Amino acid sequence: MTARGQATRRKLLNAAEMEFGNKGFHVSSVSSITGRAGVGQGTFYLYFRTKEEIFVTLVQEIGRNLRGKMQAALQAPGERSSRERAALQTFFDFSVSNRAHFRIVQEAQFVDEAVFRDYYEQIAADYAQSLEDNSEGQSAAERDPQVRAWGLLGMGHFVGLRRYLCTASDPSRQDFDSMMSLIKHQAPSQSAQGVAAPV
């Protein structure tokens, strides 16, 4: 694809992000996307076959970007617990900082369930791998990285969802700190064995 073609495709994706993020998938249309992008409808079909395809492309792109940021946090220098906290905060911040992305991902469940499932499974798999790599010294009950990963990410998702639904409220660092404090105090056996919880 030429540089000009890549720029046009990017313009369409940016327009679709705004349309889907503001109006939702079903209200948005190819014509509203191309109108926002400032291109003809025929141009759209040079890059995407359907409205569903550009939507799925956006969900996959959002997922790659988020996983990349979480991986960067997990691989950064420093203590394991600090890195895991930073990765979880990256996930939490996503839930509260970009309402359009959050809405698009949640709506994917009703547009393409397989893509929606893959989005969360890949995030959880990456986080679980980090937890598993650092599970030495934990009991069998504590060692299941999949349960821990989904549990921690689930907390981040729902605390972030609170901010998404409370439109009058701004994202708060205190929300994240309160959540991490809860995790810390619900995992005394890890500390007792010298293995820090991700706080």
Question: Which positions does each model-derived feature cover?
Answer:
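Basic, helix-initiating cap at the start of DNA-binding domains
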Residues: 1-23, 29-39, 53
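Short coil/turn segments at alpha/beta junctions that flank glycine-rich nucleotide-binding fingerprints
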Residues: 22-26, 77, 98
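Short hydrophobic/aromatic patch on the recognition helix
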Residues: 38-48
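Alpha-helical DNA-contacting segments of helix-turn-helix folds
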Residues: 48, 55-62, 116
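Hydrophobic alpha-helical connector segments
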Residues: 57, 71-97, 142, 148-152
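Amphipathic alpha-helical packing segments from all-alpha helical-bundle domains
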Residues: 64-67, 112-137, 146-151, 181
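Amphipathic alpha-helical segments used for helix-helix packing
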Residues: 92-114, 158-165
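C-terminal peripheral helix-coil segments that are non-catalytic and often amphipathic
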Residues: 93, 125-136, 155-199
